[in-house]
Amino acid sequence: MGDTIVTWTATDSSGNITLFFQTISIVDTVAPEIIPPENIIQEAENQLLNFVDLGNPETSDIVDVLSISNDAPESFPLGETIVTWTATDTSGNSAADTQLVTVQICGNSPSYYNFIMGTALDDFLTGTSLPDLIFGYGGDDIIMGNSGNDCIFGGEGNDIVFGNSGDDNITGDQGNDVIKGNSGEDTLNGGIGLDMIDGGDDIDTCIVIEEQNSDLVVKCETTE
């Protein structure tokens, strides 16, 4: 890479010499190759902040790759996010490719649900006959699911959450929560705080994180 000076010399029969200098420049104009990490489908950890391990791309270049960057956010929202990876070599050539990150919630795309949003205040939220995605956010909320297969997050505050009918997935999140699945095959997660979890009818799964083993859990056929 770079410039090389070649000296040409011409000599006649009388011994006269003429020199000519030729500059040969080797320039890298070939972009590097980049293969992004595989697309990712990840279950949401939170309604707002979801941290995703993107992995690492594969890169190659005829010289050296100077830098690898991406435009991923610090945390991912629900749904699909396209992450663009860019490799740049020491000559300034670059190549880019994309990775698709999908954050689903309760095993489904957010578009599967009817959205119901709470506020930072104390809310009373009622679901519909459709599959509802209900976020209580802040405050001490009362949340009532309905007949759909609902996905409910209590959020911050001391919440009371009823799944009612349907196969519901309920997370108390933070605070000291009361969670009742009622009918249907429900998955109930108290989250952080001292929680009372009642699976109700049918076959239910209750999740108690290790740090919260003082939660009161009843009528749960499976405990994780």
Predicted region positions:
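Proline-threonine-serine-rich low-complexity tracts
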Residues: 1-112, 124, 129, 133, ...
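Glycine-centered beta-turn/loop sites at beta-strand termini
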Residues: 109-110, 117-118, 126-127, 135-138, ...
